[in-house]
Curated annotation (Swiss-Prot):
Protein purpose: Plays an essential role in transcription initiation and cap-stealing mechanism, in which cellular capped pre-mRNAs are used to generate primers for viral transcription. Binds the cap of the target pre-RNA which is subsequently cleaved after 10-13 nucleotides by PA. Plays a role in the initiation of the viral genome replication and modulates the activity of the ribonucleoprotein (RNP) complex. In addition, participates in the inhibition of type I interferon induction through interaction with the host mitochondrial antiviral signaling protein MAVS.
Protein name: Polymerase basic protein 2
A GO-annotated cellular component: host cell mitochondrion
Lineage of the species this protein comes from: Viruses, Riboviria, Orthornavirae, Negarnaviricota, Polyploviricotina
Domain of life: Viruses
Tagged with keyword Membrane: no
GO biological process: 7-methylguanosine mRNA capping; cap snatching; symbiont-mediated suppression of host cytoplasmic pattern recognition receptor signaling pathway via inhibition of MAVS activity; symbiont-mediated suppression of host gene expression; symbiont-mediated suppression of host mRNA transcription via inhibition of RNA polymerase II activity
Pfam families: Flu_PB2_1st, Flu_PB2_2nd, Flu_PB2_3rd, Flu_PB2_4th, Flu_PB2_5th, Flu_PB2_6th
Recorded family membership: Belongs to the influenza viruses PB2 family.
Description of how the protein assembles with itself and partners: Influenza RNA polymerase is composed of three subunits: PB1, PB2 and PA. Interacts (via N-terminus) with PB1 (via C-terminus). Interacts with nucleoprotein NP (via N-terminus). Interacts (via N-terminus) with host MAVS (via N-terminus); this interaction inhibits host innate immune response.
Length: 672
């Protein structure tokens, strides 16, 4: 009260009122604010009052020789007065116009090369097709996506070294270009940018766009490859989407897609071999994708997919700490658990040994078509909030979560025996047994789960055992949400270990990945995948196995010949003959092998009966474990082209034909 009274007294004096209302603002603090530091405090205002002046621009004195004092309209382009405080000339904005129209021109040949990513983007947009706009609720989830199409996959450090080498080759500083891609790019770019007049800094900035993958964590509904992300602002809003087909593909998307296909094929093939881990490594090291070694791509490419991550783990690379189950990526966001083995009885009274997770935990589950939040305690699902594209996708997520929860009612819902096996004919572990069982048919699981009345919560509805939505009732603990669950945003990578059966574990021993998690989806790779390993010959069917086996023998004939005479057993055990065995009828394998080995022994014993063509022809049959019998064969059967084809022991056949005069060998009509 005292203060107010004091202020009133002050205001009653006319002088005070005048000072407070009429005087100019020349307060020291304000002057300081607008004059200290180099940072412009009010850029918009500064721009306005600068442009209101006649000569807002300053330029080097040389400009007076390069630009006339007046333009064609007689307007002054620069003033003879010096800029205060510097020896520069005051210039009118009209001078810029004059320069743009009449100034010297420079070669534009380097522009498309330097601004390559922009030129290519324009082409993609020109040839892209935009479809109709649909208004509907968009379920977007944040995913880590690739922002700039058309990039290589160098690390920031590698790119920095390449840029310094290309743009500032004479700059001092230790730079070691190690990877093959670094050397190739450096050579290419040096050639391209010879005599380039564009500012080096700009060139460096544009090179960075081309060399490094830029990822952002963005809300997306729909395509996640970089050619879709570059038009994200045009294709999806909060309540609308516009159909779009890109007008071109870019190599980085193709590499990602082809890498996933190659990794899946390799993991599937490795699973059925005698030593899966060794086979996987052998295949990764001998495979090329679009002409680049797969191991180099794995080291640089951040794609997270189950098969790709198994290959990375095998190579000793770090991978994401989230784990995979039922095709969903699980990330624990709260709580912890300890594992304990427990024996449980299924509805069919079959005993299963499962590793029970004891403790309260919360997870996010992210799949291709559905996402969820799961809260669980020991063998109990507390809550599952799920969102997905359609009924089917939501059902998939619910099944995975129910199995993962390890609830008793789920185990009791099993009807019939669980005997699922993997590609190598080994029984799956109990959790995957349960998963496969309910993925085939979840009717009993949903019926036995139980339902509960639900409260009306904004954005959430219930779902009934037959997967229809409801506002009154829902499966116990399960709700369907309009909002998606964001993918785990962290790019943190952890050290993992892998066993010989390709199970990947973190340092605490939790299984993050196993071959059971690798998708069976087949796709056509965008880039050529060259598998040099004999284990992958069968990927293109029986014919390819037949041709490749004989080609291998011919390519390595010099060493094969010596081994054939000196250490045949070692030769017979070569892994290159393994795929061929699948072509020989099971019942005949060991008989053929015994017969051919005996024949070869006779050739070795009787000098001068060495018959190159016959050895090449029969050698693959000798690889199976032999059966000692006196059986003789005039022809051997191989299963190609959907039926048995004969290879004649003495003589030619369509499957194996050698022309003595032209010295041409054809396998199934193809040159070997």
């Amino acid at each position: 009260m005292e203060r107010i009274k004091e202020l009133r007294d002050l205001m009653s004096q006319s002088r005070t009122r005048e000072i407070l209302t009429k005087t100019t603002v020349d307060h020291m603090a304000i002057i300081k604010k607008y004059t200290s530091g180099r940072q412009e405090k009010n850029p918009a205002l500064r721009m306005k009052w600068m442009m209101a002046m006649k000569y807002p621009i300053t330029a080097d004195k040389r400009i007076m020789e390069m630009i006339p004092e007046r333009n064609e309209q007689g307007q002054t382009l620069w003033s003879k007065t010096n800029d205060a405080g510097s020896d520069r000339v005051m210039v009118s904005p009209l001078a810029v116009t004059w320069w743009n129209r009449n100034g010297p021109t420079t070669s534009t040949v380097h522009y498309p090369k330097v601004y390559k990513t922009y030129f290519e983007k324009v082409e993609r947009l020109k040839h892209g097709t935009f479809g109709p706009v649909h208004f509907r609720n968009q379920v977007k989830i944040r995913r880590r996506v690739d922002m700039n199409p058309g990039h290589a996959d160098l690390s920031a450090k590698e790119a920095q070294d390449v840029i310094m080498e290309v743009v500032f080759p004479n700059e001092v500083g230790a730079r070691i270009l190690t990877s093959e891609s670094q050397l190739t790019i450096t050579k290419e770019k040096r050639e391209e940018l010879k005599n380039c007049n564009i500012a080096p800094l700009m060139v460096a900035y544009m090179l960075e766009r081309e060399l490094v993958r830029k990822t952002r964590f963005l809300p997306v509904a729909g395509g996640t490859s970089s050619v879709y992300i570059e038009v994200l602002h045009l294709t999806q809003g909060t309540c609308w989407e516009q159909m779009y087909t890109p007008g071109g593909e870019v190599r980085n998307d193709d590499v990602d897609q082809s890498l996933i296909i190659a990794a899946r094929n390799i993991v599937r093939r490795a699973t059925v071999s005698a030593d899966p881990l060794a086979s996987l490594l052998e295949m990764c090291h001998s495979t090329q994708i679009g002409g680049v070694r797969m191991v180099d791509i794995l080291k640089q490419n951040p794609t997270e997919e189950q098969a790709v991550d198994i290959c990375k783990a095998a190579m000793g690379l770090k991978i994401s700490s989230s784990f995979s189950f039922g095709g969903f990526t699980f990330k624990r966001t709260k709580g912890f658990s300890v594992k304990r083995e427990e024996e449980v009885l299924t509805g069919n009274l079959q005993t299963l040994k499962i590793k029970v997770h004891e403790g309260y935990e919360e997870f996010t589950m992210v799949g291709r078509r559905a996402t969820a939040i799961l809260r669980k305690a020991t063998r109990r699902m507390i809550q599952l909030i799920v969102s997905g594209r359609d009924e089917q996708s939501i059902a998939e997520a619910i099944i995975v979560a129910m199995v993962f929860s390890q609830e008793d009612c789920m185990i009791k819902a099993v009807r019939g025996d669980l005997n699922f096996v993997n590609r190598a004919n080994q029984r799956l572990n109990p959790m995957h047994q349960l998963l496969r069982h309910f993925q085939k048919d979840a009717k009993v699981l949903f019926q036995n789960w139980g339902i509960e009345p639900i409260d009306n919560v904004m954005g959430m509805i219930g779902i009934l055992p037959d997967m229809t939505p409801s506002t009154e009732m829902s499966l116990r603990g399960v709700r369907v949400s309009k909002m998606g669950v964001d993918e785990y945003s962290s790019t943190e990578r952890v050290v993992v270990s892998i066993d010989r059966f390709l199970r990947v574990r973190d340092q605490r021993g939790n299984v993050l990945l196993s071959p059971e998690e690798v998708s069976e989806t087949q796709g056509m790779e965008k880039l050529t995948i060259t598998y040099s390993s004999s284990m992958m010959w069968e990927i293109n069917g029986p014919e390819s196995v037949l041709v490749n086996t004989y080609q291998w023998i011919i390519r390595n004939w010099e060493t094969v010949k010596i081994q054939w005479s000196q250490e045949p057993t070692m030769l017979y055990n070569k892994m290159e003959f393994e795929p061929f065995q699948s072509l020989v009828p099971k019942a005949a394998r060991s008989q053929y092998s015994g017969f051919v080995r005996t024949l070869f022994q006779q050739m070795r014993d009787v000098l001068g009966t060495f018959d190159t063509v016959q050895i090449i022809k029969l050698l693959p049959f000798a690889a199976a474990p032999p059966e000692q019998s006196r059986m003789q064969f005039s022809s051997l059967t191989v299963n190609v082209r959907g039926s048995g084809m004969r290879i004649l022991v003495r003589g030619n056949s369509p499957a194996f034909n050698y022309n003595k005069t032209t010295k041409r060998l054809t396998i199934l009509g193809k040159d070997a």
